Regions:
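One-carbon transfer enzymes
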Residues: 1-148
Length: 148
């Protein structure tokens, strides 16, 4: 499926599933069944470019977390690097937050910032932010599981 996370999970002998997206309702119902069947108590989203329904979030009673490539609440949604460059921001960064029923608006678990240089463009900024995303996601999970 060309999904790096699934490749790593398979090589590490971690149970994993690929759920084909046909439509939102079917997808979410199939995912919820798998989560319940396997007694999953934390969902970590990364590069998941879909918005979960209020119903899904409510039905999955454990935390759902997401990593976002901006210093939320600034630049929710897409094109975060372009917006930061266009607005001549001095800093950008990454945020791990709890998913709620509003886009990129849940409680912030952890953030880290990077300096935006005059020489930066979308591509170089994306690379810098991705580097800290990899660093802070595991920290956020530990923080969440140890109740901060």
């Amino acid at each position: 499926f060309n999904v790096k996370g699934l490749e790593i999970a398979s090589k590490s002998r971690i149970k994993n599933y690929y759920v084909k997206y046909s439509n939102k309702r079917n997808f979410e119902n199939r995912v919820l069944k798998l989560l319940n069947k396997n007694k999953i108590d934390l969902i970590c989203l990364a590069g998941f470019m879909k918005i979960l329904s209020k119903k899904f979030i409510k039905k999955f009673s454990s935390p759902i977390i997401n990593i976002h490539p901006s210093l939320l609440p600034k630049y929710k949604g897409l094109n975060t690097h372009m917006k930061a460059i266009k607005n001549k921001d001095k800093y950008s960064g990454a945020t791990v937050h709890i998913v709620n029923d509003k886009l990129d608006s849940g409680k912030i678990i952890i953030q880290e910032k990077v300096r935006i240089l005059k020489s930066d463009n979308e591509k170089t900024l994306k690379k810098k932010v991705l580097k800290i995303e990899h660093k802070i996601y595991s920290k956020a999970i530990i923080k969440l599981l140890t109740n901060y």
